C-alpha cells in the first residue's frame, strides 16, 4: 500500500506532454485507439493530430504507469481504454498546473500593456 502511494505521488508530480494530456482527456470515457485519435483532433480543432505509432506507444506507457487501463478487447481485436482513478488525479493536477501557467502569462502580458 505504502509503495503504491509513493508511486502515484511521483506520477502526479510528473509533467505530461501535450499528447499524454489529450489522451487522458479523451479517456474520461472508454474509447478505442482510432476514436481517441479522432476525438483529440476534434477537441483541439485539428491543432493536434496523432499518428497510430505515437498513440499506441503512449497508450502502453500510460497503461504501465496505471494512469489508464485496457478495459476490453472486442472480437475483431480492437482494444478499448479508460482513465483510472490515479490517471484522473494526474489529469486534475495537470489541468490546475496549466491553468496557473496561463493565468501567470495573462497577468504579465496585461501588466506590460498587452490586452488578454
Task: Show where each model-derived region lies.
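Intrinsically disordered, low-complexity serine/threonine- and proline-rich regulatory segments
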Residues: 1-15, 98
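Amphipathic alpha-helical dimerization/coiled-coil segments
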Residues: 4, 92-116
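N-terminal helix-turn-helix DNA-binding core of bacterial DNA-binding proteins
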Residues: 11-54
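Conserved amphipathic alpha-helical interaction elements at protein-protein interfaces in regulatory
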Residues: 42, 46, 61-64, 104, ...
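Short, hydrophobic-biased segments on the C-terminal half of alpha helices
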Residues: 56-60
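Beta-hairpin "wing" of winged helix-turn-helix
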Residues: 63-76, 82
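Basic, amphipathic "hinge/linker" alpha-helix immediately C-terminal to the N-terminal HTH DNA-binding motif
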Residues: 75-95
